[in-house]
Swiss-Prot record:
Main localization of the protein described in the UniProt heading: cytoplasm
Localization (cell): Cytoplasm; Nucleus
Gene name, Swiss-Prot/TrEMBL: CCHCR1
Coiled coil: 78-298, 341-392
Protein name, as recorded: Coiled-coil alpha-helical rod protein 1
GO biological process, one term: protein export from nucleus
Protein role: May be a regulator of keratinocyte proliferation or differentiation.
InterPro entries the record matches: HCR
Biased composition (Basic and acidic residues): 204-214
Length: 427
């Protein structure tokens, strides 16, 4: 611009140079010694722009240096142009330094905000870690409770199976012993009847020659046979009556056999059911407490969100960057809160599922208790049936024993009469 305008004469006067060094402004100490690459590019471009001007000035001075009249004026003109360019360059550098200072201040504020944001995020992550740890501990507790309930259920099943097998084994042993005793009694009675028949046949064969003496004995034997047939008919009638009585006893007699064992088992099952119901009530109470916690956290988060929104309202309309960052921070805070609420809801649903599963186990145990009660009633009825059958067999054996004693008494009388008849014949 100096080459196109007129230059006043005072511009060519000699100016004294300052002897004291210039002091740097106080804001220069805040500028870092190492400039960013962008600033170095700006200085290099400025130095490149100055180089062609200095080269042109040297060419003009060398071209016009031969003229003696223009030499002094051209030197002063070139010096003034160089000074004006240096002043303009210094002003540009000062503007650039002020701009760099403003950028440094903005970067410091940004780094401070980022530091505060990182601290808040670290606190949020720590709170989330504590919540996750608490949720894991609660899940482990529920898994332990379910494992305990499963162990109790398996123990109940094993105990019921062992008791049922023991009852069946005892019933089978008792039935086999009763059958064996009945067979032994029948074989002994058959053997005794065979012996009696043999003794009667031998007596008839030996006394066949004495018809008169043995006629009475034959009549008595015939009478004995008739009595035996009548006894057999009476025995069959008694067996029929015993069968009817057994059926009547199986229908009318109340269950009293092994009642104490089944009552203790029933009491144990009722205690187990009561304990599971108490566990269910405890889990229900825990679910209600978790619901209260969720509501409290929701209320607290709403209050904190309102307070945060009130604090981050922009006081100056010339700060859109700060407002945008605050809005982004508020948005992230809402996302974290939503994730925490989703996690709490998932824990609540899982807890509810565990409670429903425990309810199903309690219902299954109650149904099994009822089924075992019905099986117990059936076994009691069958035991009563077997007891009545044993009693009938005992009565049958007693009747047969009485008949046998009567037959032996008749035989003894017949032998006595035979002996008396022999003595009379000898006389």
């Amino acid at each position: 611009s100096g080459s196109t305008r007129l230059i006043p004469p005072s511009h060519f006067q000699a100016r004294p140079h300052p002897t004291l060094p210039r002091m740097a402004p106080p804001w220069v100490s805040d500028i870092p010694l190492v400039q960013p690459p962008a600033h170095q590019d700006v200085l290099e471009r400025l130095s490149d722009n100055q180089r062609p001007q200095v080269t042109m000035w040297e060419k003009e001075v060398s071209g016009k240096g031969q003229e003696p009249g223009w030499r002094g004026r051209s030197v002063e003109l070139a010096g003034s142009q160089a000074l004006s360019q240096q002043a303009e360059l210094i002003s540009r550098q000062l503007q650039e330094l002020r701009r760099l200072e403003e950028e440094v201040r903005v970067l410091r504020e940004t780094s401070l905000q980022q530091k505060m944001r990182l601290e808040s995020q670290a606190m949020e992550l720590e709170a989330l870690a504590r919540a996750e740890k608490a949720g894991r501990a609660e899940a482990e507790g529920l898994r332990a409770a379910l494992a305990g309930a499963e162990v109790v259920r398996k123990n109940l099943e094993e105990g019921s199976q062992r008791e049922l097998e023991e009852v069946q084994r005892l019933h089978q042993e008792e039935l086999s012993s009763l059958t064996q005793a009945h067979q032994e009694a029948l074989s002994s009675l058959t053997h005794k009847a065979g012996g009696l028949e043999k003794s009667l046949s031998s007596l008839e064969t030996r006394r066949s020659e004495e018809a008169k003496e043995l006629a009475a004995a034959q009549r008595e034997a015939e009478l004995l046979r008739q009595q035996l047939s009548k006894t057999q008919e009476a025995l069959e009638a008694q067996v029929t009556l015993a069968e009817n009585l057994r059926r009547y006893v199986g229908e009318q007699v109340p269950p009293e056999v092994h009642s104490q064992t089944w009552e203790s088992e029933r009491q144990e099952l009722l205690e187990t059911v009561q304990q599971l119901q108490e566990d269910r009530d405890g889990l229900h109470t825990t679910a209600e407490l978790l619901q209260v916690r969720v509501q409290s956290l929701t209320h607290i988060l709403c209050i904190q969100e309102e307070e945060l929104a009130r604090k981050v309202q922009p006081s100056d309309c010339l700060e859109p960057e700060f407002t945008r960052k605050c809005q982004a921070l508020l948005k992230r805070w809402r996302e974290k809160v939503f994730a925490l609420m989703v996690q709490l809801k998932a824990q609540e649903l899982e807890h509810r599922g565990c409670v429903e599963q425990l309810k199903g186990q309690v219902a299954e145990l109650q149904e099994r208790a009822e089924t075992q009660g019905q099986e117990r009633a059936i076994l009691e009825r069958s035991l009563q049936d077997k007891a009545a059958e044993v009693e009938v067999e005992r009565m049958s054996a007693k009747a047969l024993q009485i008949e046998l004693s009567r037959a032996q008494e008749a035989r003894r009388r017949r032998q006595q009469q035979t002996a008396e008849a022999e003595e009379q014949l000898k006389l």
